[in-house]
């Protein structure tokens, strides 16, 4: 009996010890751009290396058990950033059939506390990533949908996102989404500024089309903290 109790106690201690070993990079402070504008660092000067994976459709395709399994494996593989699409389409649905939005961009009617609603499921993803020491790089809406989001809707959406996630430690904002930056510029600006107004706590960038860089269009924007370049993964004509 004593031996059994000892084994159980040892197992609990081992599990607890392993959980305590999860490295939380934001314990070094918020992310920011270094003084020489060459690197991402934390507030205390600790360098941050973006080891990211593109799990774009994570909010739509995986249920909660799968999210936990996937993000745990990502941590074990050494990833510290997951790049996801918040909205891939209008409307967007998750694995539970819950709707994220419609063309009105009135998100209040799609928040469902206590259910597996779209936004509650996204909250779960963000929190599960945090428990694994992983940042969520939120691409707010995929570039192909920009013609459905005017400046007014972009401002509403940005306010909604910024207020919802401004106190989460593991958020990186991505405007755009595999698109040329000269398309929908006014809407991208409105979205970015609304997020920044509601959430000054997290860094922001623009995700461009393959073989382009955000610097071509947004380098002078006050909301852009750092540029992104996409090498591309197909032919571009």
Q: Model-found features: residue ranges?
A:
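Positively charged n-region of N-terminal signal peptides that target proteins for export
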Residues: 1-4
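Hydrophobic h-region of N-terminal signal peptides that target proteins for export
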Residues: 9-18
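Active-site mouth of glycoside hydrolases
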Residues: 23-236
């Amino acid at each position: 009996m004593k031996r059994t109790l000892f084994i159980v106690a040892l197992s609990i201690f081992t599990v607890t010890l392993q959980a305590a070993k999860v490295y939380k990079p934001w314990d070094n402070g918020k992310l920011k751009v270094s003084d020489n504008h060459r690197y991402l660092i934390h507030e205390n000067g600790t360098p941050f290396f973006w080891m990211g994976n593109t799990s774009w459709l994570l909010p739509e395709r995986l249920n909660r058990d799968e999210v936990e399994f996937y993000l745990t494996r990502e941590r074990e593989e050494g990833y510290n950033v997951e790049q996801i699409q918040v909205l891939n389409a209008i409307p967007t649905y998750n694995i539970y059939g819950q709707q994220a939005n419609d063309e009105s961009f009135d998100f209040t009617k799609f928040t469902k506390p206590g259910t597996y609603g779209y936004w509650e499921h996204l909250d779960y993803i963000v929190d599960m990533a945090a428990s694994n020491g992983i940042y969520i790089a939120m691409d707010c809406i995929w570039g192909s949908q920009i013609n459905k989001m005017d400046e007014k809707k972009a401002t509403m959406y940005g306010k909604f996102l910024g207020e919802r996630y401004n106190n989460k430690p593991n958020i990186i904002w991505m405007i755009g989404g595999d698109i040329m930056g000269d398309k929908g510029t006014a809407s991208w600006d409105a979205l970015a500024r609304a997020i920044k107004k509601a959430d000054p706590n997290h860094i922001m960038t623009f995700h461009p089309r393959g073989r382009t860089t955000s610097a071509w269009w947004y380098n002078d924007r006050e909301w852009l903290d750092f540029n992104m370049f996409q090498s591309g993964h197909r032919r571009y004509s």
